[in-house]
């Protein structure tokens, strides 16, 4: 029954992420307000919904229901630490200065790297290619509507100090509909 709702004849686009707790999410919302009121007051941006902030650990892609179940079993076997500290350190474009994506960069701690590696092992084991890219943790704040956006300097946001603990790894389905990305929470794994 659940698969009929989630998959509707198509493979789901799946990603795993750390979802900010209320404290961290409130700090991210305040950061977005500051950006909107200062350097980006005239910018044409699709801002991330305040309820959709997340720090992606692994974007798996299209999965069959059986693969999803196998992934759940693999994640349940991971020994996570009791909590994870997330430290947001700067506002930037992602993956490079020419991009449309506006993000809050997270410090790439050993704990984050270990979670990334453990999850990557699980998805590789069930037939998905290992992520060859360097893991660059971030939380999306918004996306510029125009590819030829003006240049912006985030000097005053180059050393932000936003931090909190998280203790849940979430599995989401991502769906693109009428120019907007919608996320559906499928399952949560508490540390």
Tell where the protein language model's regions lie, with residue ranges.
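Histidine-dependent nucleotide/RNA phosphoesterase domain, centered on the 2H-phosphoesterase fold
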Residues: 6-191
